[in-house]
């Protein structure tokens, strides 16, 4: 039986992880579930999968959560102390589904603990942690398996084929919920428009990132770090059906494409089953059901956010600029969701923040957090000028 911890269990990805664990409960022993504020769902999940512990990061909700679990033997913790405890547990698999840079410090704690595998649904911690985080993981012999469908696809191909004779890695993009809109229509996009993704079930923040295609910029930087690949060997293509998740091309003109139905349960199952594979818990791919698979170049005019990742990789300080990009985007997306700014303002605010913040070399976790804090302050100030 594998021991598992789940961070961000009440989010969109976290809920899928819980569903899979529950469907094969005889295979997993859940040591701890961690959530931010959804105590009702957290308590329900804990009972469902027989978790030993739960952690709520909002300390003000500790007593209420404790009351919800009075009839159980489940231990309850809260706040920073609870998070430190959760990351120090001896587990085989840690599932990291916390959104944004908030996952970075817990990731660092996890790598320094006795965890063997971290399944990572959080691209921001790689973008911000960069080579520092991955070097620490290598030093501690911790395997990081990406849960993003695109990076998981590339990870699986490389696990089998390696980097030999590799010419290019192509990440696919669904195009998001606004693909068919023209630029003029995008001036009037609402929050509701952006969170209706045509293919994937996602949380609000990642749905907006998909709509701006800044998610693909973050994924380009993530791939740069995860796969130790040069920027010029990375590419993005729009693939609306989301059947092909990643493509590796070789110097002899051949390519290997990773294909599956668009279901996040597939990379989650892969990570939980690694180094083996388990029987599918979702529909299997039947290409006969598809009349066609389409591919197109991204429209840079409509979606300038997709260029940001490549532009960051061209700079002399990739690490700091990746942190700045991520911080500005998180602030801008939150402002858009709060209806303080328009949709097209998001990318403009990120560009403006990248132009205004000039941070030095990143040599430590404290540097990362400092650069992030400065960037958030600048992005917030830029937003205030618009409001």
Curated annotation (Swiss-Prot):
GO molecular-function terms, A-Z: 1-deoxy-D-xylulose-5-phosphate reductoisomerase activity; manganese ion binding; NADPH binding
Transmembrane region(s): none
InterPro entries, per database record: DXP_reductoisomerase, DXP_reductoisomerase_C, DXP_reductoisomerase_N, DXPR_C, DXPR_C_sf, NAD(P)-bd_dom_sf
Enzyme class, spelled out: oxidoreductase
Pfam families per UniProt: DXP_redisom_C, DXP_reductoisom, DXPR_C
Stated family: Belongs to the DXR family.
NCBIfam families: Dxr
Name listed for the protein in its UniProt record: 1-deoxy-D-xylulose 5-phosphate reductoisomerase
């Amino acid at each position: 039986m594998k021991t598992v911890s789940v961070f961000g269990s009440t989010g969109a990805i976290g809920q899928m992880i819980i569903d899979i664990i529950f469907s094969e409960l005889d295979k997993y022993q859940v040591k701890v579930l961690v959530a931010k504020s959804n105590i009702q769902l957290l308590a329900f999940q804990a009972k469902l999968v027989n978790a030993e512990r739960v952690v709520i990061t909002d300390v003000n909700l500790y007593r209420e959560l404790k009351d919800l679990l009075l009839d159980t033997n489940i231990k309850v913790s809260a706040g920073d102390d609870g998070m430190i405890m959760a990351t120090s547990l001896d587990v085989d698999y840690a599932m990291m589904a916390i959104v944004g840079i908030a996952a970075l410090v817990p990731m660092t704690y996890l790598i320094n603990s006795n965890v063997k595998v971290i399944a990572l649904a959080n691209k921001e911690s790689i973008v911000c942690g960069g080579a520092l985080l991955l070097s620490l993981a290598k030093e501690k012999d911790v395997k990081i398996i990406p849960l993003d469908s695109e990076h998981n696809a590339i990870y699986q191909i490389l696990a089998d084929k390696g980097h030999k004779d590799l010419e290019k890695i192509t990440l696919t993009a669904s195009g998001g919920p606004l693909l068919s809109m023209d630029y003029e229509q995008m001036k009037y996009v609402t929050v509701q428009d952006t969170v209706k993704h045509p293919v994937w079930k996602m949380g609000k923040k990642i749905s907006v990132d998909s709509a701006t295609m800044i998610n693909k910029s973050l994924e380009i930087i993530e791939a740069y770090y995860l796969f130790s690949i040069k920027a010029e060997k990375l590419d993005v293509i729009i693939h609306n059906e989301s059947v092909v998740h990643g493509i590796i091309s070789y110097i002899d003109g051949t390519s290997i494409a990773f294909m599956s139905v668009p279901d996040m349960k597939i990379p989650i199952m892969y990570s939980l089953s690694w180094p083996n594979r388990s029987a599918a818990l979702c529909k299997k791919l039947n290409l006969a059901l598809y009349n066609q698979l389409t591919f197109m170049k991204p429209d840079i005019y409509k979606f300038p956010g997709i260029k940001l990742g490549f532009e960051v990789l061209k700079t002399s300080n990739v690490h700091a600029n990746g942190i700045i990009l991520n911080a500005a985007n998180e602030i801008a997306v939150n402002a858009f969701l709060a209806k303080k700014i328009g949709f097209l303002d998001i990318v403009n605010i990120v560009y403006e923040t990248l132009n205004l913040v000039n941070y030095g070399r990143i040599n430590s976790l404290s540097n990362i957090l400092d650069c992030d804090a400065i960037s958030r302050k600048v992005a917030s100030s830029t937003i205030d000028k618009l409001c």
